Amino acid sequence: MANRGPSYGLSREVQEKIEQKYDADLENKLVDWIILQCAEDIEHPPPGRTHFQKWLMDGTVLCKLINSLYPPGQEPIPKISESKMAFKQMEQISQFLKAAEVYGVRTTDIFQTVDLWEGKDMAAVQRTLMALGSVAVTKDDGCYRGEPSWFHRKAQQNRRGFSEEQLRQGQNVIGLQMGSNKGASQAGMTGYGMPRQIM
């Protein structure tokens, strides 16, 4: 980020549009959930996009978050390093992203490492954390800590099974338009582009 110069023209417009998607209220809700979920000595960051980015940038908070969503002994990231080296921090972010995908977050909801590392798209980071919270609430396996109303519950399939007798009874039902001549028909329709014949 330090080596990147300012963007101009269309690039600047696109970046401004991306930055407008960031939600400060959502940031507060996510920070509260992460601190409550991790149940460790994680300090509350000052409000603001850049502080939120710096708080998550080394990957330790994200790794602690994904580990807290699993039962003890089944954590997907066994070793969390608090290294100051850039490639180690980026590696931890990518470990979090892989673990989130395994947990059930769709690949379309997962941000790219540079979105967080360079602060390119912090709204995408928020979307990933929201999707992770939604999956955690939906799983309802006892590992989620926090208000269930903070995240929406994802829809789950509810398959229905019909017996052969029920399927046969469904074939006996007469459709609503069968035998009716008042429904939609093509009477009076002319071909496309032809003039209407009025006599």
Curated annotation (Swiss-Prot):
GO biological process terms held by the UniProt record: actin filament organization; negative regulation of transcription by RNA polymerase II
GO cellular component: actin cytoskeleton; nucleus; synapse
Keywords: Phosphoprotein
Calponin-like repeats: 174-199
Keyword Phosphoprotein: yes
Cleavable signal peptide: none
SMART domains with a match to the protein in the record: CH
CDD domains in the record: CH_TAGLN3
Chain positions with Phosphoserine modification: 163
Family stated for the protein in its record: Belongs to the calponin family.
Listed name of the protein: Transgelin-3
